[in-house]
Amino acid sequence: MASSSSSSRWSYDVFLSFRGEDTRKTFTSHLYEVLNDKGIKTFQDDKRLEYGATIPGELCKAIEESQFAIVVFSENYATSRWCLNELVKIMECKTRFKQTVIPIFYDVDPSHVRNQKESFAKAFEEHETKYKDDVEGIQRWRIALNEAANLKGSCDNRDKTDADCIRQIVDQISSKLCKISLSYLQNIVGIDTHLEKIESLLEIGINGVRIMGIWGMGGVGKTTIARAIFDTLLGRMDSSYQFDGACFLKDIKENKRGMHSLQNALLSELLREKANYNNEEDGKHQMASRLRSKKVLIVLDDIDNKDHYLEYLAGDLDWFGNGSRIIITTRDKHLIEKNDIIYEVTALPDHESIQLFKQHAFGKEVPNENFEKLSLEVVNYAKGLPLALKVWGSLLHNLRLTEWKSAIEHMKNNSYSGIIDKLKISYDGLEPKQQEMFLDIACFLRGEEKDYILQILESCHIGAEYGLRILIDKSLVFISEYNQVQMHDLIQDMGKYIVNFQKDPGERSRLWLAKEVEEVMSNNTGTMAMEAIWVSSYSSTLRFSNQAVKNMKRLRVFNMGRSSTHYAIDYLPNNLRCFVCTNYPWESFPSTFELKMLVHLQLRHNSLRHLWTETKHLPSLRRIDLSWSKRLTRTPDFTGMPNLEYVNLYQCSNLEEVHHSLGCCSKVIGLYLNDCKSLKRFPCVNVESLEYLGLRSCDSLEKLPEIYGRMKPEIQIHMQGSGIRELPSSIFQYKTHVTKLLLWNMKNLVALPSSICRLKSLVSLSVSGCSKLESLPEEIGDLDNLRVFDASDTLILRPPSSIIRLNKLIILMFRGFKDGVHFEFPPVAEGLHSLEYLNLSYCNLIDGGLPEEIGSLSSLKKLDLSRNNFEHLPSSIAQLGALQSLDLKDCQRLTQLPELPPELNELHVDCHMALKFIHYLVTKRKKLHRVKLDDAHNDTMYNLFAYTMFQNISSMRHDISASDSLSLTVFTGQPYPEKIPSWFHHQGWDSSVSVNLPENWYIPDKFLGFAVCYSRSLIDTTAHLIPVCDDKMSRMTQKLALSECDTESSNYSEWDIHFFFVPFAGLWDTSKANGKTPNDYGIIRLSFSGEEKMYGLRLLYKEGPEVNALLQMRENSNEPTEHSTGIRRTQYNNRTSFYELING
């Protein structure tokens, strides 16, 4: 159950309390992983040191904000004052905040915890000796232990496996969270009826893909209903309701970021990995190919036909896996007429309308009978529309009886047509300035970011922030998850209706339709009433008229959109606050304009060579946006702009210099000069207010001047790809303020100043691609908080020895060609304790280039040593206990694999190396589940690999047992052709395969099991051994949980081939045989979890005379068996000896 559905009082679902030295790397890490996989937001203090007695404030805050606390009592739990104080805090929060505490007794007796016996008694003896002056504190510990050990719902792992214990705890929490997260449904009026009908229509337990359309007018509650059914289906515990992925895509028609952004959001949510496709066609292809095997639940909310959303988001049923359900909400019935189901949402019946209105007007109880009667009058006017009931209820909330009567009388005396007119009462209840703000948002600012809107509104209206809060409180606008100011369509329609009440466009206060603006401009009908013109669409016929604009003395906001005007703009009203014009055709902006009120100037994609030549006094100006000004060579003088906050010069490709007066602008927050390819001179800047400085890809900028002023903690400086040769030391004068420094692809950078090592808060540092950088500062080890360091593609040959002091470093990369010289990594003993990923590929490493004690990197999970020249590897690699992935591809001189770490599950080597050591890989490294072979590009190589791998199984000296169910995935380096290695005799493509077995196929002590191969994604597979005759004989069944072989199984793809072995010892159950022999069973069936696969299968024997005789047999009949009806079968043709080399 997703934690987002939990009560807003909690920041976390679960807080984990544990003794690090006992369970951090075992039980607790597994529990944390399962909780996260279930979508349960869990706080685990990964970096806890457990020194001292006082727990940090942020840890106390996390405990207070967690809905559940899991306490893992282990043998040494009581030895830690940290843990005991943490427990005291947890039990306090249980009392204060009604949190749920779940104790787990990990290899300890609950009575030992409850009564402090055994190891707990010993720990308290030491505490009482050492802290004898803190009697009260010790007593608090004892009480907390006693209370925790007496709690219900505990788990004792002594009578169950770790997996069972974890499953019990996670199921317990999931169930409670599900009930809590769905509790909000109790407050949605009439929702039960909708849920019952929709769930029945969706027929969740039925196979196939279904698309349902929820249709109705705006404001009738379609989104609310869709969200409720979405949460309800996800909250069901029944297995038929389990989906592989789910996504609620809200307010689709308001999307302004392109179709591909919606596709990326949908794919990211469903696949649980970041999707970043740049156009809708790529996104469409990926959705069709990657979701077809996934059972998904999708809601596409508020679809219209403007941008053909359905075509690109749910174009075909074949896009989605069996059992998928797609729900669409829309006002346009014709968009969903071809779907399986259309569910119409109509107005609420009277009794539900009254209930909903009272919920918003009164909260709980109606004050008296007079309000009851007035409520019925309001409900009657609403005509059952939920939006109107909510808005009017909020409007009348906390008003006196006389005010109620006045508002209702106002409704009666104004015969508005339709609900839009009725919603106007909300507008009429606003102050005049708040009304003006509302109309600005409704007519042209809806969907813009909150900060941007406030800046425009504040330039026009006093108290804009307070006014926006009033609009939110009155349910007229709301802030979206993207921090955009949004409103319901009907509310927006109501605002536009108010403005359009006057018939003549020239007499209106606001215009937003291009054709109406064109009419006013061409007929010179502008008047003093005009306050704002905002054209967001392109118009090829819109022409600017100076005469028409001269009549608009009160014009505050003027956005001409993307017009093709070639008429000179000679006049703009002095009252203007915001001017926007895309494709501005002239080389300069008129110097005669006196725009002292101007706040926002945006002239993108213009023909400007310069904005103006003289100094302009613009005291109100906060934003200048001249991005994509391809002909602009210099900026204006900024001296007269003391309040300037944002300057956007992005992709001004001919801009050569920024005026030095920019350094006088102390309020600047953002400077955007990325991709200014010709920029050569940049002034000193004041960084007191600066939050972003973008100089990325400024190729010609070789020098960055000193900066002055105190940096803000959140400042971001992007210089990657620039031509800067050296960095000014003033950037690093404030030691705690920079957390990320990206310097990659700075081709001229020759050195880093030693002052960079003062950045004590630096978390991420990249000098990747700085091809002239030869060394690092000797004090690099002083960067105590550094977690990511990328020095790929540089000339660095030996990092400073101090680098091993970076004990918080997680990722370290020196990847890159060293041009004939050899890279050498310093000794690492007693250092780099947190390092998880080390990339030394392409480093021209030779023997001795790696430290012999590399095995001391205890946290290392991924090591990339590909394309190097060493002949041997340090033997201590075997001591890398956490290592999961090792890359040795294209190491041409490597002749011997070292002993591999025990936890390794992915190995990337060349094919010849894999074949040479396949016996070792198969028999000695059972946790190895994936081998990556970039150079295995033909069927012969795959056949050889399969033959060699399974030959090693047959050559095992011990008997094959159920535990020998080998699973190994081969990454091929290219999408695998539609072909399975021919060594597998039985081949096909289906979600299930049945193979008829020959007579006497089973030879005691000779038959080993079934060798199986299939392509594409790794899924669980079930093997069935089926009797020849239906003589009430039981099937033999074995489920192979292959998807659990690797925690990163989601990485498996069409580039992979999966080999696995079904041992006969694991399939055959003598207790079910009832005296029958294996030869009484004549069919082997494999089921691939409902997903179609390209498969191959082969029976596997030890060599011997009986086997040779069997292999000469042929099946006498090709008739299908009664057991395989409706399932694709592959007939048993001939079978060569396992030891015979590959056919073909």
Swiss-Prot record:
SMART domains: LRR_TYP, TIR. The keyword DNA-binding does not apply. Its EC number is 3.2.2.6. Changing R142 to K/S: Partial loss of resistance. Changing D301 to H/N/Y: Loss of resistance. LRR repeats lie at residues 597-618, 620-642, 643-665, 834-854, 859-880, 882-904. Residues 172-447 form the NB-ARC domain. One of its GO terms (cellular component) is cytoplasm. It holds the Pfam family LRR_13. Changing R325 to Y/G: Loss of resistance. Keywords: ATP-binding, Cytoplasm, Hydrolase, Hypersensitive response, Leucine-rich repeat, NAD, Nucleotide-binding, Plant defense, Repeat. The active site is at E86. GO terms for biological process: plant-type hypersensitive response; signal transduction. Residues 10-177 form the TIR domain. Changing W141 to S/A: Partial loss of resistance. Disulfide bonds: none annotated. It catalyses: NAD(+) + H2O = ADP-D-ribose + nicotinamide + H(+). Changing G218 to V/S: Partial loss of resistance. Changing P619 to A/T: Partial loss of resistance. The keyword Transit peptide does not apply. It is found in: Cytoplasm. ATP binds at G216, M217, G218, G219, V220, G221, K222, T223. PANTHER family: ADP-RIBOSYL CYCLASE_CYCLIC ADP-RIBOSE HYDROLASE, LEUCINE-RICH REPEAT-CONTAINING PROTEIN. The TIR domain mediates NAD(+) hydrolase (NADase) activity. Self-association of TIR domains is required for NADase activity. Belongs to the disease resistance NB-LRR family. This is TMV resistance protein N. The gene is N.
